[in-house]
Amino acid sequence: MDILCEENTSLSSTTNSLMQLNEDTRLYSNDFNSGEANTSDAFNWTVESENRTNLSCEGCLSPSCLSLLHLQEKNWSALLTAVVIILTIAGNILVIMAVSLEKKLQNATNYFLMSLAIADMLLGFLVMPVSMLTILYGYRWPLPSKLCAVWIYLDVLFSTASIMHLCAISLDRYVAIQNPIHHSRFNSRTKAFLKIIAVWTISVGISMPIPVFGLQDDSKVFKEGSCLLADDNFVLIGSFVSFFIPLTIMVITYFLTIKSLQKEATLCVSDLGTRAKLASFSFLPQSSLSSEKLFQRSIHRDPGSYTGRRTMQSISNEQKACKVLGIVFFLFVVMWCPFFITNIMAVICKESCNEDVIGALLNVFVWIGYLSSAVNPLVYTLFNKTYRSAFSRYIQCQYKENKKPLQLILVNTIPALAYKSSQLQMGQKKNSKQDAKTTDNDCSMVALGKQHSEDASKDNSDGVNEKVSCV
């Protein structure tokens, strides 16, 4: 049934209109059945019925009337936003559970990611549903006016917290690469949580002016019945402080981190190359074989080579982590940049730009920015095995990793250990045999040298005696 939306119209007038419409319909059906209706009668009836059943909103500017109109239409955009809300809440809950329950993920970077997931989850709980409600009501505020400033405050708070967390992660990893000893000494769980508290404090401080001024003056948060920031100064300052400045810091430190990792990898490879050359270089004459072998063994057993391998492994892990974080950074920038750029354009070219087009773009771009909160858990799932296995177990309601029974562990490990021990014993026997051979060769060489020297001295003494006898 269509809606007669005329302001200040009583229920009786609406009822009378509907009764008149039914009466006209009945008369027309009787005339049509009796064959007396012609084309002109049908046309007159159609025009009259359309005039009565059209949504006549002349003078109807109240939000309640307009909201009823929009609720009658199918709104596919609201359905899409509902899907985004569900993905955001569910995915970030899985991230929070994974960092809380998995010991492998309990480090400084993942604590930041857990706090970021909390911000995204709260965005999905408190901000996105209200935004979907405004879509259903034609982008007009359907709730009490005092809640508008609170809703904008939460929106700015959680969005600012997201970019601040990414900026803090980038800074923390850069400091860890530049000063690893200092960072490992002073980097603990308490320090990580203190940094997270600092990030939230900065985010609250940036977004706090919205409820302070918005609750006092509705014109700062309302514009033509829509709940949005109407203060141009706050739009400009807030966009730069909460997005563009942290974005610049994040991008610069991220590229510096990549450059430092590449430099360390090059130095580590060159260091391993010099160690290999030293191991193959001979300092002694060829006759002294045992000393050379002992020197080579001491080089190969040098713990520095193990340290070099461990350093290469740590650099490789850092590069993999930077790759995942780089994807998260890139997606966040790509999804939020259109909104903030359009937001600044709306303030700069206020008179020359079409406000309707700018408003429509902002309504679309803000949901693209919200989508980044749902994408992060998918990135972790695709590029991190620990997150992927944890998510799959949590979906199956298995919150602890299944451990193998002790008997199965013994069956699998004891033969391997026995094989390794036998190999070690065989290697030790071979080494002892080779050492015995080399020592025998050395002893024989020494004996030959002694015999040769004795023979030479004997010959010399015989020559002297012959000379004496001749004299």
UniProtKB/Swiss-Prot annotation:
Question: Which CDD domains does the annotation name?
Answer: 7tmA_5-HT2A
State the activity regulation: G-protein coupled receptor activity is regulated by lipids: oleamide increases HTR2A-mediated activity.
Chain sites annotated for binding serotonin: 155, 343
Q: Where is this region: Disordered?
A: 450-471
Single GO MF annotation:
serotonin receptor activity
UniProt GO cellular component terms: axon; caveola; cytoplasmic vesicle; dendrite; G protein-coupled serotonin receptor complex; plasma membrane; presynapse
Residues with an annotated glycan are 8, 38, 44, 51, 54
Q: Where is this motif: PDZ-binding?
A: 469-471
Q: Where is this site: Hydrophobic barrier that decreases the speed of ligand binding and dissociation?
A: 229
Which residue ranges does the entry give as Cytoplasmic-facing topology? 98-111, 172-191, 259-322, 383-471
Q: What is its main location?
A: membrane
Q: Does the keyword Transmembrane apply?
A: yes
Report the residue ranges where the short sequence motif NPxxY motif is annotated in this entry.
376-380
The UniProt entry lists membrane topology as: Multi-pass membrane protein
Question: Family per UniProt?
Answer: Belongs to the G-protein coupled receptor 1 family.
Specify the protein name: 5-hydroxytryptamine receptor 2A
Q: Which species does this protein come from?
A: Macaca mulatta
